A protein has these predicted regions:
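Interfacial loop-to-transmembrane junctions
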Residues: 263-285
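Membrane-embedded alpha-helical bundles of polytopic integral membrane proteins
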Residues: 2-244
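Juxtamembrane interface at the ends
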Residues: 184-185, 189-190, 258-266
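Hydrophobic alpha-helical transmembrane segments of membrane transport and translocation systems
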Residues: 287, 292-295
């Protein structure tokens, strides 16, 4: 029975209200993040990005723990912190090539550590293989993909005075990704009839998917129109291609986390912010849009 106050039945939280809570919380958090990014204090930006990334990784392994799936959470957290710190240092102070080498070295060290750690546990059927697989998947899916947000800041050449210019592309990334989420919800709520993948996410529709692509494309073109100097390496063709690509990747990122939550029997990955859930719910779409934008900038826009 629903809880009552003075004899009145408490009204259930509607889907619309949940979306509004989630949207407001997301905007509030990323507004703070962008203020820090644009403050010019690169170390402050790193601390914020690292905190969100490590929290997302911790809560991901928490979902596995809730299902009883074995993993080496602490080992992954330590390696994740090293990866984030090293990538920030090499990208901001040394160079891109050295950053790649460092990242590969961390992954190699992580594999060696996980195998060595597993050797001291007893062999129980396929438990060792599952433990190592779950641990490695968590680091790659959450932290390795998430780390591309930092890379985007530094993949764009600095200004002549040495100032970082890549923060505008992080703003672009977040805005286009979140407009995709918004477009999927609004369009799906208004005209959604045909289910997209109901066994993973019953509420998502093909109409919502089309709305996500439309909103992300319009957001991409709109941002280029509003900030032509700040997004100087992009042109309208890039904006259209990225708008469609990032919108598609955002939907896949959202569905990917829904798949993981259904597999682990968890509704929300945590209680990081009202209406959002956990940190993985906050960054799920960005896990695929961030690397996509990075590689597009590096291999298409900024290619020699």
């Amino acid at each position: 029975m629903s809880a009552t106050v003075d004899g009145a039945t408490a009204k259930p939280i509607t889907k619309k209200l949940t979306f509004l809570f989630r949207f407001a919380s997301t905007i509030a958090l990323w507004s703070v993040a962008l203020l820090i990014i644009f403050s010019g204090y690169e170390i402050a930006f790193f601390c914020l990005i690292a905190a969100i990334g490590l929290l997302a990784l911790w809560e991901f392994y928490g979902m596995l723990d809730a299902k009883g799936l074995p993993n080496f959470k602490i080992t992954a957290m330590l390696c994740g912190a090293i990866m984030l710190s090293g990538s920030f240092y090499y990208y901001s102070k040394v160079g891109v090539a050295q950053s790649y080498d460092f990242e590969m070295a961390v992954l190699l060290g992580f594999l060696l550590t996980v195998f060595t750690r597993q050797m001291f546990d007893s062999l129980r059927d396929d438990a060792p293989l599952r433990t190592m697989a779950y641990t490695l998947f968590g680091l790659l899916y959450v932290l390795w993909l998430y780390n591309f947000i930092t890379k985007i800041v530094y993949v764009v050449p600095r200004a002549p005075d040495g100032a970082v210019q890549g923060q505008f592309y992080v703003l672009y990334l977040i805005a286009v990704t979140k407009f995709s989420d918004m477009g999927a919800y609004i369009t799906g709520s208004l005209i959604g009839r045909h289910k997209l993948i109901p066994h993973i996410s019953p509420g998502k529709t093909w109409e919502g998917f089309a709305g996500a692509l439309a909103f992300s494309s319009l957001a991409s073109l709109g941002l280029l129109y509003l900030m032509p100097k700040q997004l100087a390496v992009l042109n309208p063709t890039h904006a259209i291609v990225l708008g469609l690509s990032l919108g598609f990747a955002a939907v896949i990122g959202d569905l990917a986390e829904s798949l993981i939550k259904r597999s682990t029997g968890v509704k929300d990955s945590g209680n990081f912010l009202p209406g959002i859930g956990g940190a993985p719910d906050l960054v799920d779409s960005l896990l695929f849009t961030a690397p996509l934008l990075f590689f597009y900038l590096r291999l298409v826009v900024l290619a020699p």
